[in-house]
């Protein structure tokens, strides 16, 4: 069973394990590595509305949110198993609108399109790659 639960301070070591992995960072706008000390400060100051993705109560990834923007990172050991798709479906089920940014060459773009996200024409260049915005307008 897959579910989303709010991120807690105790989840930060797991979050860093996923976030600081090179295979995750290559697809993030800010690809810096973070320390636990930096992450604790961030968590305590911002109280983010992020969610841990659990499969049978085992953490496999997380959903990032910032207002209407959403993103998802899955631990490298659990990718290509459909967890991101289900997590997005759970997160989006009650949403009228969401947006995200994705590198145009990121294979996850196909997933976003299947979920109903469409490109809106906004793009920027980051590290010589095209970073595009996609929007979801409910179902």
Where are these regions (language model features)?
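Conserved beta-hairpin
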Residues: 49-61
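A short, well-structured alpha-helix characteristic of acyl/acetyltransferase catalytic modules
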Residues: 1-33, 37-41
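Short hydrophobic/aromatic beta-strand or adjacent loop that forms the aromatic wall/cage
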Residues: 48, 129-134
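Conserved beta-strand-loop-alpha-helix junction that forms the acyl-donor binding cleft
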Residues: 99-113, 117-118, 124-130
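A conserved beta-strand-loop-helix scaffold within acyl/acetyltransferase catalytic domains
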Residues: 61-68
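A short, internal acetyl-CoA/4′-phosphopantetheine-binding micro-motif in the GNAT/acyltransferase core
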Residues: 69-83, 102-103
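Conserved acetyl-CoA-binding loop-helix of GNAT-fold acetyltransferases
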Residues: 80-94, 110-114
